[in-house]
Amino acid sequence: VGIDVRVLARAPGPDGGVLVAHLLVDCRDAMGANLVNTLCEALADRVARIAGGRPGLRILSNLTDRRTVTVRCSIDDAQLACEDAAGPEVRAAIAAASRFAELDPYRAATHNKGIMNGVDAVLVATGQDWRAVEAGAHAFACRGGAYRPLAVWRERPGGGGLDGELVMPLAVGTVGGALHVHPGARLALELAGTERADRLAALAGAANLTTNLT
């Protein structure tokens, strides 16, 4: 738990200075929206007094860049081979397509859409707020000032296979929210063996990387 502060605009100006205070909360196995919003409401007036201003919005952000998941995989050429192409040829083509997505935001949008095909399926089945994750993922993809792919694929150094890595924000929960009244979501969590939020995030991340490859 902590606080980060950013100054977005300094006085003088039409609205004076604009300061943002980020309340960082470890939500454990909850998605945490209700908890964070409640804390923001409770602390807003105190923070405003300290800053010498007035409180504005008191709400969570769906750009949860402190709550990311990282998934990696390595695939041998033999597993990449198909009827129409040998493994090294497939490997080179996938790496080239990934590089294209890194260079071109138009390609990156479709690249990331394929990733979200996987995560949305997992999130809907397990009763998560998939719209929040979508919003955060696309904002995260733009964090450097240009729209970038959430997953990248590289030819293995020395050849012989393909390495993939996905990094994206994934705020999910296995307790709280609507889960206690959603028997289908509870069953999906039990079938997946995901009692903890970090395990659910890892599962969703693995689905993301898989759908991006296929």
Task: List the predicted regions and their residue ranges.
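Intrinsically disordered, low-complexity linker/loop segments enriched in Gly/Pro
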Residues: 1-43
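Polar low-complexity intrinsically disordered regions
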Residues: 12-14, 156-161, 214
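Hydrophobic alpha-helical segments, principally membrane-spanning helices and signal/leader peptides
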Residues: 17, 96, 197-199
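Short, flexible active-site loop motifs that bind/organize anionic cofactors or intermediates
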Residues: 26, 105, 206
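Glycine-rich anion/phosphate-binding loop at the beta-strand->alpha-helix junction
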Residues: 29-31, 36-181
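Catalytic-core signal marking the mid-to-C-terminal active-site face
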Residues: 162-163, 169-214
